[in-house]
Regions:
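Short, well-structured beta-strand-loop connectors
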Residues: 17-26, 59-77
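Zn2+-dependent peptidoglycan hydrolase active-site motif and core
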Residues: 20-58, 87-88
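Short polar/acidic secondary-structure junctions
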Residues: 15-16, 30-32, 80
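Short glycine/threonine/proline-enriched tight-turn/helix- or strand-capping micro-motif at secondary-structure
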Residues: 1-20
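Short alpha-helix capping/helix-loop boundary micro-motifs
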Residues: 12, 57-60
Length: 107
């Protein structure tokens, strides 16, 4: 199966620590059938970030308030839909539940 996706894949070694891009509240943590272990952070003002293909060793809990740079978990290989790809973080950004190009926040 071939599928395109929103967001970006950021190459990193398996086991690399994944940190929050900004402060916020952990909205949910779940195992997505395509993207693997995923953490969604609500940053307020309509912004949310999503971190996928994480290992099962998640370091935060749902409803937890976090700061910018909080360790969320580690790069894993749980994204069944991208299992043939090199280890990476699948990162998505949303504004008012609409997908936003994540590269727009990196300068």
């Amino acid at each position: 199966m071939w599928k395109t996706h929103d967001g970006i894949d950021i190459k990193a070694d398996k086991g690399t620590v994944v940190k929050s891009i900004e402060k916020g509240n952990v909205e949910k943590i779940y195992n997505d059938s395509f993207y693997g272990y995923t953490i969604v952070i609500d940053h307020g003002q309509g912004y949310k970030s999503s971190y996928s293909n994480l290992s099962e060793d998640v370091l935060v809990k749902a409803k937890q308030t976090i700061n910018k740079g909080t360790k969320l978990g580690y790069i894993g290989d749980t994204a069944i839909g991208e299992i043939k790809d090199e280890p990476h973080l699948h990162f998505m950004l949303f504004l008012n539940n609409e997908n936003v190009d994540p590269t727009s926040i990196f300068k």
